[in-house]
A protein has these predicted regions:
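SIR2/sirtuin-family catalytic core signature
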Residues: 1-17, 23, 27-28, 35-38, ...
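C-terminal or late-domain output modules
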Residues: 7, 89, 109, 113, ...
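PAPS-dependent sulfotransferase catalytic core
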Residues: 16-19, 24, 30, 53-61
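Extended, H/D-rich, highly charged conserved domains that either
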Residues: 42-128, 138-272
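Surface-exposed cleft-lining segments at the edges of enzyme active sites
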Residues: 133-143, 279-285
Length: 368
């Protein structure tokens, strides 16, 4: 069996420099300055917010926010963050990784003690601004027009196509199922789906918000996070919730004592009230379940050869952990951009049968 895991490098190869991190951030700022953004979905203040966060970048590098880290994954993320930047120099707003802005966001909000719903709403606006910049007014969905016949043929030679990209260029060019590990611009998030399990509950989780279908990509399943553990959590939470709910309902229906306990739960607590309502609703409508929108299990199931192209060995560690744990992957072919990436890949996959290849040679061959 042959599988391939594809990252943003493939979009950059065919779509150009506009999909580099710096240009995505610049486009986000330019969209706001030109008033060519959906202001009702993310306000113009988002641009000021980016610059305010960027001003704290140096402070975060030099330990100022160390005491405002309250979770293990945030601490790990901050350590990694410090390793990726030079603490002796200043970085412009476009030199900071756009996902790192979300770490800075959390650190500052921790320091200021800002909580939900203000924190949630601000994070959501920041996410929409960056996703809109990646989407590039839909231009990203046309990148496949630059794919060569040879590249498409190579893609089709694989049994499984997996990607961390949000766009549908691989889907369109091959006509095959593509597994979007971090979500897709074209898939509505369960949060905004009126037919989803969570939106059948009495409480209005969306607080009356209506989806603007002129901008479906801003309501999509795309994962944007500064830490792989949070992406991994988002990828697995639906399956875990379904498993837990099945156990609750089974106990509720088969154990009279547990049924009495659940029926007597104090509904003055919103979380308890929602859980109780969900159990009763699931018991009455067993077909209801949380949609599993991320194919997170696939990396544990594939076998044979896995080729990796367009990804850095220093990002998406949560995915590489699944690959390392999968004993049925007998060979990894890592396409690198330069000697440093090759060395990093060899260190990362030292326990695997690994071969490396310069991605520039790959493109010369496949496009010939």
């Amino acid at each position: 069996m042959r599988s391939v895991l594809i990252g943003n490098g493939v979009v950059i190869q065919h779509g150009g420099a506009g999909y580099f991190n710096a240009n995505i951030i610049q486009r986000a700022l330019d969209n706001i300055r030109a008033e060519s953004h959906p202001a009702h979905l993310y306000p113009e203040e988002c641009a000021d917010f980016v610059f305010a966060l960027a001003k704290e970048h140096s402070a975060a590098l030099n330990g100022y926010y160390d005491n405002y880290v309250f979770t293990t994954y945030d601490r790990v993320s901050l350590t990694d963050f410090k390793l990726r930047y030079d603490s002796t120099r200043k970085y412009s707003a476009t030199e900071i990784g756009f996902e790192d802005y979300f770490l800075l966001f959390e650190l500052i909000h921790n320091k200021l003690g800002v909580t939900n719903p203000e924190r949630f709403n601000s994070r959501c606006a920041l996410r929409r601004m960056f996703l809109d910049a990646v989407f590039n007014k839909g231009k990203i969905e046309s990148v496949h027009k630059q794919f060569s016949v040879g590249f498409v043929k190579w893609l089709k030679s694989h049994n499984n196509i997996l990607t961390t990209n949000y766009d549908s260029n691989l889907d369109i060019s091959t006509g095959l199922p593509v597994h979007h590990l971090h979500g897709s611009f074209n898939t509505l998030s369960e949060v905004y789906d009126p037919n989803s399990f969570r939106n059948q509950l009495e409480d209005d989780f969306l607080n009356g918000e209506k989806v603007d279908f002129d901008y479906p990509h801003l309501y999509s399943t795309c994962l944007v996070s500064y830490v792989g553990d949070l992406k991994s959590h988002s990828m697995t939470q639906s399956s875990l919730a379904n498993s837990g709910m099945e156990k609750f309902v089974e106990g509720y229906q088969s154990n009279p004592d547990l049924r009495k306990q659940i029926d007597a739960w104090d509904e003055s607590n919103d979380l308890v009230k929602r859980l109780k309502e969900a159990i009763l609703l699931k018991a009455e409508h067993p077909e209801l379940e949380h949609s599993e929108q991320y194919p997170h299990k696939l990396l544990r199931k594939i076998s044979g050869t896995l080729e990796i192209i367009g990804l850095s060995p220093n990002n998406d560690g949560h995915l590489f952990e699944h690959i390392l744990d999968n004993r049925n992957i007998t060979q990894i072919v890592f396409h690198h951009f330069g000697a440093q990436e090759a060395a990093d890949a060899e260190r990362l996959f030292s326990s695997k049968n690994l071969s490396t290849r310069d991605v520039r040679d790959f493109w010369l061959d496949v496009n010939a």
